[in-house]
Each structure stands twice: as structure tokens, then as C-alpha cells.
A protein has these predicted regions:
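Single conserved hydrophobic/aromatic residue that forms the stacking wall/gate
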Residues: 2-9, 13
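Active-site phosphate-binding and catalytic loops of NTP-dependent enzymes
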Residues: 24-43, 127, 225-232, 255
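Glycine-rich adenosyl-nucleotide cofactor-binding module
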Residues: 32-33, 50, 57-105
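Switch/coupling sub-region of P-loop NTPases
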Residues: 89, 93-105, 118-241, 247-249
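Walker A (P-loop) phosphate-binding loop of P-loop NTPases
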Residues: 109
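Conserved lysine of the Walker
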Residues: 112
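Hydrophobic positions on the alpha1 helix immediately C-terminal to the Walker A/P-loop
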Residues: 115
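NTP-binding/hydrolysis catalytic cores, primarily Walker-type P-loop NTPases
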Residues: 254-324
Length: 324
């Protein structure tokens, strides 16, 4: 993991830093100033940039850059470093090809965007894909017909902004085979779910959650941010829209792993029903390699309940392999 560094700077350097910040944000049609002192942006190489200015940043401007690797992370690489096993990767590939709606959850720094990129590269190359992001960072290489859309901030008068909700609604008129929403944080969760429930199968997205159950609760809260809707109706929308949750985690040794794969099986009128297919189990060995976490993502013995999409895509039960 890349360490974080901090440094004290003179007023001259602070002014120079502000100039650099303005160049960065203006290059992607963003703005940051005292009245709007926080912004997320990106560099030309796709690196994520977070900027905080006075008066929020008391000691002066703060710039945090999260760089991407020079090479694209592949599923093969994730298997090599132990983030996922081959049999689970094959299982997810089958689900992507069969157009299951997959939601990736995890905490900050757990690798959600990286994993979304990797899964996206399983999408057949002849499909039309639309990506929608707050700040463009996805690097999908498997499809030629790719439409990328990015949020536009409002101007200083608070006008002419285009948010994720507007982009999702626009994307529905663009005849996509799949819609990929980089991350849902608020009311746009409802629009994403409605897209999933209106024939746009195979859609992918991510969100912050500490567990699959926590992610479902957070999605309920996000939907309520945008509409006054009965909780049962929200739960029903989530249960019918999302097929699979892949939960990622950053462990105490700073490794990133797939911790759980959960199928959403339905709604019983009160609760969203789930079926855990894979779960990470840590080896209980005292003093193992000086704090290195040892364990494996294991099949629970539960099989995929909703198999209709697999059959509709031309697969049979013999094509499903869960591994150990």
C-alpha cells in the first residue's frame, strides 16, 4: 500500500499549489474556491484527485492523489495475488455473461473500482455499454461501443449542473445493452434500480458498505434521499433489481480480497432474502507469518437459486462450477 506523506509549506508554495490545483480542476470542467472548497477531480492519466481549500483546510490547501497502476489490473493478476480464486472468477464470469445485475460493496480502499474494471472486461465485445461516473476513472477495454459520461458540476450560481441521476435517465434513451454506474452515494440509487428493473440486465455498480447486509441497508437509505416511498416498496425494488452482491475488504495486513458473494433471492414482504454462496474464512493459526492474513474464499455449499438468466443465455446446470 502506498504510504501517505505530509509537508509544511510556506505561503509562497501554498499559492503555487493553489495555482496547480486550479489547472487540474479546470482541465476537467470542475471548479474549487472558498465558497466551494472541496472537489473531486482526476488527472489525464486517470488518477483520482481530492482537493480541500481554505476555510475548510485550516493549515492550507490539501491535495490527495490516488494513482492507478501503470498497467491494467486483470482477473489473472487478482488470482495471482490471492484476492480471488480461479473457480470463483470463473463463476463470476459466467454471471456477467448471463447478464446478472452485480453490485460491488466494500469500504474505502477495498478495491471496488478495480474490481468493477475487471468484471467489466468479461462483457462481450459486441455490446453497447454506457458508463456513468462522478469522476471518470473506469478503464473498460473489452468493448468498442463504449459511451462514457461524467457528472458536470454546477457553476458559481448553482446552475447548469448535471448529476448522476440525470445521466442515468439520459442513458436509458441511448439503447444500452448494459449500464455501469461507477458508484452510488445518494438518491441516484433509485434511478439505478429502476434501470435494472426495466430490462437493462447485466448492469454493474459499486457502493460503500461494511457487509452485504449493511450495503442493502445503505441502499434503502440512499433511495429515501430522493423519494418519499414506503420502505417495503424500496426493499422490493432492491430485491428485484440486484441479483448478486460481491463484497470486498481490506484486511489488517492491507491486502484486498473478495470476502463474500451473496445472491439476492427475493423479498418476503418484510425482508430482502439472501443466499451466501462464497465466504472468506481465515485460517486460525497463531503467529502466522508475522501478521499476514491467511485464508480462502470458500464455497458455502449453497447453490445459485435464481438460474433463469443462465438458462436464457444458453447455459445449463452443467456449466455452473462452484469449486471446493
Amino acid at each position: 500500500s502506498t504510504p501517505l506523506y505530509s509537508s509544511a509549506a510556506s505561503d509562497v508554495y501554498k499559492r503555487q499549489l493553489v495555482d496547480i490545483i486550479q489547472q487540474i480542476v479546470s482541465g476537467v470542467n470542475r471548479r474549487v474556491n472558498e465558497s466551494s472548497p472541496i472537489v473531486d477531480s482526476r488527472l489525464s492519466d486517470g488518477s483520482r484527485v481530492n482537493v480541500v481549500l481554505n476555510p475548510v483546510a485550516i493549515n492550507g490547501p490539501v491535495v490527495t492523489i490516488r494513482k492507478f497502476p501503470e498497467y491494467s489490473i486483470t482477473m489473472k493478476k487478482l488470482i495471482e495475488i490471492g484476492s480471488i480464486s480461479l473457480n470463483v472468477a470463473d463463476f463470476l464470469k459466467l454471471l456477467v455473461n448471463a447478464k446478472y445485475n452485480i453490485f460491488i460493496s466494500g469500504g474505502t480502499g477495498s478495491g471496488k473500482t478495480t474490481f468493477l474494471n475487471v468484471l467489466s472486461n468479461y462483457i462481450p465485445g459486441d455490446e453497447r455499454i454506457i458508463t456513468i461516473e462522478d469522476s471518470a476513472e473506469l478503464q473498460i477495454q473489452s468493448v468498442d461501443n463504449l459511451v462514457r459520461m461524467e457528472v458536470r458540476q454546477a457553476n458559481d450560481e448553482g446552475e447548469n449542473g448535471i448529476d448522476i441521476r440525470a445521466l442515468i435517465k439520459s442513458s436509458l434513451r441511448m439503447r444500452p445493452d448494459r449500464i455501469i454506474v461507477g458508484e452510488v452515494r445518494g438518491a441516484e440509487a433509485l434511478d439505478m434500480l429502476q434501470a435494472m428493473n426495466t430490462g437493462h440486465d447485466g448492469s454493474l455498480s459499486t457502493g460503500h458498505g461494511n457487509s452485504p447486509k449493511d450495503m442493502l441497508n445503505r441502499l434503502e437509505t440512499m433511495v429515501l434521499m430522493g423519494v418519499d416511498m414506503p420502505l417495503k416498496a424500496i426493499k422490493s425494488q432492491i430485491a428485484s433489481g440486484i441479483d448478486i452482491i460481491v463484497h470486498l475488504g481490506r484486511l489488517r495486513d492491507r491486502t484486498r480480497k473478495v470476502l463474500e458473494i451473496v445472491e439476492i433471492t427475493g423479498f418476503n414482504g418484510e425482508e430482502i432474502l439472501t443466499n451466501t454462496i462464497y465466504r472468506f474464512e481465515e485460517d486460525n493459526i497463531e503467529g502466522t507469518n508475522k501478521g499476514i492474513v491467511k485464508g480462502k474464499l470458500k464455497w458455502t455449499g449453497n447453490t445459485l437459486i435464481n438460474q433463469k438468466k443462465l438458462f436464457d443465455a444458453g447455459y445449463g446446470k452443467e456449466d455452473i462450477s462452484y469449486g471446493e
